[in-house]
Amino acid sequence: MSTPTLPDMVAPSPRVRVKDRCRRMMGDLRLSVIDQCNLRCRYCMPEEHYTWLPRQDLLSVKEISAIVDVFLSVGVSKVRITGGEPLIRPDLPEIVRTLSAKVGEDSGLRDLAITTNGVLLADRVDGLKAAGMKRITVSLDTLQPERFKAISQRNSHDKVIAGIKAVAAAGFTDTKIDTTVMRGANHDELADLIEFARTVNAEVRFIEYMDVGGATHWAWEKVFTKANMLESLEKRYGRIEPLPKHDTAPANRYALPDGTTFGIIASTTEPFCATCDRSRLTADGLWLHCLYAISGINLREPLRAGATHDDLVETVTTGWRRRTDRGAEQRLAQRERGVFLPLSTLKADPHLEMHTRGG
C-alpha cells in the first residue's frame, strides 16, 4: 500500500470544542484499525465468512496519526483502539507508539486505551506496554470453556484467561473486562465474573445484548436487562449502591457492600444518546457518528487527495455540528423491534457490520 506524503499535516490548529445539534461535545474517538477477527461471537459476527474491507484502503500508521491529530484539534480527549481484533494488525505496536506520543496537555489527549478479545494478548501485552498503551479492556463472556466455545465458535478460552492474567502481571491499572450478557447463555455467571475480576485487579462491565449490525440472532427475549442484573446480584451480595457519575462514559457503576465495583452498560433498555460524545472511525477511514449509523463521512479519500489538516478539521467540524444521531433511543422507541439489519444487507456493505465500526 502506497502511503502519501503528508507535508501539511504536521501543524495542528488550536483546539476547539464542537457541539452537535443536541449540544453534545465531541470527546471520545473509537479507532478501528482492522475489520478482521479471530473469533466468531454470535452477538457480533456469527457467520464464518465475511466480505473484508480492501486491504489497500486501510489507513497507514501515518494516515491514522494525521486523522487523530484532526480529532484532537476539535475536542477529542480519549482514543480507544478497536477492531475487529486489533492485535491481528501486524503494525499495531507502531500505531500505539505513534498515538501514545501524543498523550499530554499540549495535544489534549488524556487517555489511550485498547479493546481486545484477548486471544493474542499474553504474547503481545509486554509489547503494548513498551509502546505506551495506557489501559486495556478485554472481552470475556464466560468463565466456562464449553460456553466460550458455544458463544465464540472457537476453542480459545484458555488463551483469553492467560491474556487477562498477563495484563495484571504487566502492571496495567484501570483494566476492564467487558461481558455481553445474554439470557440463556451466560446470565447466571455475573457474580462469578465479578469474583474473577477481583483476582486480576480488573473491573467487570456487564453489557446488555445489543441489536447492532451483525447481531443477526438478536431477540428481545435474549436481553438480560440492567434491572435483571441488579436483581440477580443483590440476591448474592445484598444491597448494591449506585456510584455518582462524573463523565459521559456509558457505564453506570455500582459498589458491593465490601466496596468492590462493577459497571453496567444498558444501551438497549436505557440508551445514553443524550450525553453520547463518541464517534467511530473505521479502519479504512469512514467516520461514523453513531453505532447505528447507516452512512458516514469518508476521510481517507480527501486525505489521500492532498487535503490539509485544516481542510479535514473543517470537514469534521461541519459534520459534527450537523449530527443529530440518537440511534439507540430510536431503536428503543420501536414497537416491534427485531434484527437491526438482515444478513443480505450486511453482506452488501461491510461498513454496516459491528466488527467494522469498533463496537
UniProtKB/Swiss-Prot annotation:
Residues 21-241 form the Radical SAM core domain. Induction: Expression is positively regulated by the transcriptional regulator MoaR1. Its EC number is 4.1.99.22. It catalyses: GTP + AH2 + S-adenosyl-L-methionine = (8S)-3',8-cyclo-7,8-dihydroguanosine 5'-triphosphate + 5'-deoxyadenosine + L-methionine + A + H(+). It holds the Pfam family Mob_synth_C. [4Fe-4S] cluster 2 binds at C273, C276, C290. Keywords: 4Fe-4S, GTP-binding, Iron, Iron-sulfur, Lyase, Metal-binding, Molybdenum cofactor biosynthesis, Nucleotide-binding, S-adenosyl-L-methionine. Its cofactor is [4Fe-4S] cluster. GO terms for cellular component: plasma membrane. Catalyzes the cyclization of GTP to (8S)-3',8-cyclo-7,8-dihydroguanosine 5'-triphosphate. Monomer and homodimer. This is GTP 3',8-cyclase 1.
